[in-house]
Amino acid sequence: MVTIRLARHGAKKRPFYQVVVTDSRNARNGRFIERVGFFNPLASGAEEETRLDLARVAHWVGLGATVSDRVAALIKAANKAA
């Protein structure tokens, strides 16, 4: 099953997440099909907190991809801001 979820990157105590489309059987930070955005929970000042390619997210959801809870909240916030 294809899912859209967060893959953790960054340094210790400084998380940075990539929003990726992947097979649900792959490891959290493992192989992915496509990167559709990022989420920086520690963004401050002029730094960008979230960037999502909503067209690609809609494409994958249309093909039957499931969305994790956290990514669903990010999509909702991005739609509200746009």
From Swiss-Prot:
Gene3D superfamilies membership: 3.30.1320.10
Gene Ontology, cellular component aspect: cytoplasm; small ribosomal subunit
Pfam families membership: Ribosomal_S16
Annotated GO biological process: translation
UniProt entry tagged with the keyword Ribosomal protein: yes
Keyword Lyase: no
PROSITE patterns per UniProt: RIBOSOMAL_S16 (PS00732)
Keywords: Ribonucleoprotein, Ribosomal protein
Gene Ontology molecular function: any one: structural constituent of ribosome
NCBIfam families with a match to the protein in the record: S16
HAMAP family xref list: Ribosomal_bS16
Family per similarity comment: Belongs to the bacterial ribosomal protein bS16 family.
Entry protein name: Small ribosomal subunit protein bS16
Gene source species: Enterobacter sp. (strain 638)
